Amino acid sequence: QAVNPGKNFGPYGLPKSALLSLCKQYAVDYGSYGIRSNGVNADRIRSGLMTDKMIKTRAKARSVSTDNYMRGNLLLDEVKAEDVAKAFFHLATSKKTTGAVLTVDGGNIAASLR
């Protein structure tokens, strides 16, 4: 929702979008002090926010099964919390990376930066 806003998702998407921009701004402002700032932009992760009820509602609205909804990306594979954790770990251990936003969404082309 940060780069692909949906109807009535402003209260969710706006802060997420601002936070991704802030990660980049901090990299500019604090990089000369050796401080790195990166972000992870994930999509469709089962969580306390994206509940089974929400997944069912969204799948029904798109006339697809819940499995197909969760695999609705270019890789046709559900993105799991473990995948997102690996992205955070990668950025935390990449000492020469700053100002990056790593997208973990299986290739959701509708949500790619334009």
Locate each region found by the language model:
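Cytosolic ligand/metal-binding cores
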Residues: 10
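Short, flexible catalytic-loop segment of classical short-chain dehydrogenase/reductase
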Residues: 41-57
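Catalytic Tyr-x(3-8)-Lys segment
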Residues: 59-82
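C-terminal substrate-recognition "lid" of short-chain dehydrogenase/reductases
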Residues: 78-104, 109
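Alpha-helical segment proximal to the catalytic Tyr-Lys
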Residues: 28-32
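Active-site helix of classical SDR
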Residues: 15, 23
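Conserved SDR Rossmann-fold cofactor-binding beta-strand/turn motif
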Residues: 36-46, 103-105
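Active-site segment of SDR-like NAD(P)-dependent oxidoreductases
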Residues: 1-4, 108
